[in-house]
Amino acid sequence: MKRSVDARQRELKVHLTVLTDDEGRPIPKDAPIPLYEPPVFQDVHNANRKAIIIGAGPAGLFAALTLIEHGIQPIIYERGKEVSERKKDIALLNRNEGLNPESNYCFGEGGAGTFSDGKLFSRSKKRGNMQRVMELFHYFGAPDTVLYEAHAHIGSDKLPGIIKRMRECILEHGGEIHFESRIDSLRELKVESLKFKDSPIILAIGHSAHDTYRMLAAEGVALETKGFAMGVRIEHPQSLINKLMYRGLTSNSSPKGKESNLIDFVGNASYSLVTQVDGRGVYSFCMCPGGHIVPAGSAAKSCVVNGMSASHRNSPYANSGMVVQINPEDIPGDDPLRGLLFQEELERLAFEHGKAPYIAPAQRMKDFVEGKESKDLPACSFLPGIIPSRLDQWLPAHIGKRLQQGFRDFDRKHPGFLTNEAVILGVESRSSSAVRIVRDPETMESVSTPGLYPCGEGAGYAGGITSSALDGIHAALQVITSQPLL
């Protein structure tokens, strides 16, 4: 069962895939037919087999749930706080009252996606049973729409409660979760306790765990640079995006008219844009209709932005990352962490061009393309605040010039997209991991470190909540089928 909206033409179309009986008649919604087979979790309090999981993001949580289904006790170490305490630290950051480097938009229970929109969508068609991921989210409280919407979305206001219920399930069935427990050495973890000595480790860190990458490199774990993307986050008035994407229809100009009814039915418009500039992709990333821009850094003296939407997606702003593809050969050297170092360099540069502590540098979109100073800035959803800055001058040329041409290309496709009503903020640098923890393609085990199973976005094998969750499931299944190390 699937529902998708095609708004490419003036006549909007809704595509439905429905479940029917043998004679082709749609099955009623209230028919006594289960939507899916619910999970069956075992009691693992006294399980003989244990597995350590580092990270309580989607990869780590779904790995833990899978282990419990198969009678293995998961022991999770999470550097950040549980979700309700994490929410308090994020509120302080939004008010410009300080950054907790261990509890923020990147670190803590649920991972980065918990407070950055909650999209349940993956572009990949080759990763496996995504539907099972959706079913588990639904089992723990996600709305029915996650089972059939083509671009399912939970929202940053709803996802924390779902994550909490996952945690409660893990603990109820005998798993362990240790918060505020950053792992600073794999070697020390393996010898910390006899009960852990022979346990496999599922490494499910997020892409912002730069200190963990450095620890892994120092301990001889095989790493390599991978392609990633960096750029800016852009924000338009949502009413303008509705007009452009719904072919001339507007959102709230007539509360009782067809435009308002349309938005009520299909929601605020989103977009997915891509072009090629000088051999590199330029594209929108994590588009958040009716959303907000948020401070997504995890280190002092750095400025990182991201986007999020609540479940109703009803703010007056539409934001999206606008990023440029960066290949390993674009960064000189052979250090596997050189992409990470480039990220950090640009984040520090954005901080220097903003205003301490976390006010972001910003420029009107058309001024950026035309190389002009923005004398003032439009209203913006970024709570810490924005300050005028010449992003066109200080962004690296291979990023800035491609973004300028990319914006022109997008305006040709959607006339009116390039406008000074829109504002760009720097920098969007955490769209994906710049490092890959090298693993065997069949067993998912580290090629250098027996018993280590890297997975998820931080390992460089996923991008987003659903693909990370599925990779965590796959890693757990590999642990389950492997012979226990005795």
Placement of each model-derived feature along the sequence:
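Residues forming the flavin
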Residues: 1-115, 119-486
